[in-house]
């Protein structure tokens, strides 16, 4: 069996185009364009690339894009003060603070300071809690993007055995909640999991997010499984690969996401979706 490729680039472009149409309709009706503030602290090269792609996507869909590039020496108090200012700014619908933050700044404190109605990354306890209670509003970007991919490929998830490899706050944990909402029987594995291979071999739908190149061998994949590879790993030779041995897995799976070009583009597209949603669901009411 040769797997069908789940093309994240194409779906992400569709999502962005749909948002652009809605933004154009808003402005034509005399409403303001949604606004996103992107905050980068320090000069981490990978973070600069991610932030650049987010800002570019904002401009493409017609958002107001605000950039705040702060020096490595920025204190936690200074960053919190900026967030307070942005929380009160009526032009801004979404606030994104690029992680990781420099040493000495508490990630949790910073993310919790963002107003839940401007938390377009979906990391605030309020938004995570709503997802857990089956009443999601702003949802974490990567898990929501993965659900969008499955939906756009008309993959019926109800009743599937879904296995999530990795239990991070950004992907693994919220992904497990999304999969429960999607009707899956869901297992989350982590560094203490025994018999990992057995779990993988049982998966109808496998989501891998550990950040280790080739962590899951292709021969572990169940015949006909759907494989979603969240990993983005750059090898010494410059090649970018996922957490799954792609060629071997693709020979057994029914669907698979490539790396690059699978999940990555969806994370940015979902951030754009979330910003429009925050504008429409939370901030339009205040304008009325």
Curated annotation (Swiss-Prot):
PROSITE patterns: THF_DHG_CYH_1, THF_DHG_CYH_2. Pathway: One-carbon metabolism; tetrahydrofolate interconversion. This is Bifunctional protein FolD. It catalyses: (6R)-5,10-methylene-5,6,7,8-tetrahydrofolate + NADP(+) = (6R)-5,10-methenyltetrahydrofolate + NADPH; (6R)-5,10-methenyltetrahydrofolate + H2O = (6R)-10-formyltetrahydrofolate + H(+). GO terms for molecular function: methenyltetrahydrofolate cyclohydrolase activity; methylenetetrahydrofolate dehydrogenase (NADP+) activity. Transmembrane segments: none annotated. NADP(+) binds at residues 166-168, 232. The keyword Transport does not apply. CDD domains: NAD_bind_m-THF_DH_Cyclohyd (cd01080). Catalyzes the oxidation of 5,10-methylenetetrahydrofolate to 5,10-methenyltetrahydrofolate and then the hydrolysis of 5,10-methenyltetrahydrofolate to 10-formyltetrahydrofolate. SUPFAM superfamilies: Aminoacid dehydrogenase-like, N-terminal domain (SSF53223), NAD(P)-binding Rossmann-fold domains (SSF51735). It comes from Enterobacter sp. (strain 638).
């Amino acid at each position: 069996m040769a797997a069908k490729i789940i093309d994240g680039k194409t779906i992400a472009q569709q999502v962005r185009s749909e948002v652009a149409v809605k933004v154009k309709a808003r402005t034509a009706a005399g409403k303001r364009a949604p606004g996103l503030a992107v905050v980068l602290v320090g000069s981490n090269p990978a973070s600069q690339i991610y932030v650049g792609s987010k800002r570019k996507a904002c401009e493409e869909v017609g958002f107001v894009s605000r950039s705040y590039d702060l020096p490595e020496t920025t204190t936690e108090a200074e960053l919190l003060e900026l967030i307070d200012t942005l929380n009160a700014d009526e032009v801004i619908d979404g606030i994104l603070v690029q992680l990781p933050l420099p040493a000495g700044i508490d990630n949790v404190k910073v993310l919790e300071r963002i107003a839940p109605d401007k938390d377009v990354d979906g990391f605030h306890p309020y938004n995570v809690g709503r997802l857990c209670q089956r009443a999601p509003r702003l949802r974490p970007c990567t898990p929501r993007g993965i659900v969008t991919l499955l939906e756009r490929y008309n993959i019926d998830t109800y009743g599937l055995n879904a296995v999530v490899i990795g239990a991070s706050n950004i992907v693994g944990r919220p992904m497990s909640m999304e999969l429960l909402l999607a009707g899956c029987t869901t297992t989350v594995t982590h560094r203490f999991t025994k018999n990992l291979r057995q779990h993988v071999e049982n998966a109808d739908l496998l989501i891998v997010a550990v950040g280790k190149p080739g962590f899951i061998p292709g021969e572990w994949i169940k015949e006909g499984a759907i494989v979603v590879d969240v990993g983005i790993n750059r090898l010494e030779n410059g090649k970018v690969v996922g957490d799954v041995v792609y060629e071997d897995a693709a020979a057994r799976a029914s669907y698979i996401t490539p790396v690059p070009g699978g999940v990555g583009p969806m994370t940015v597209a979902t951030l754009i979706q979330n910003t429009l949603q925050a504008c429409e669901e939370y901030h339009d009411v205040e304008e009325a």
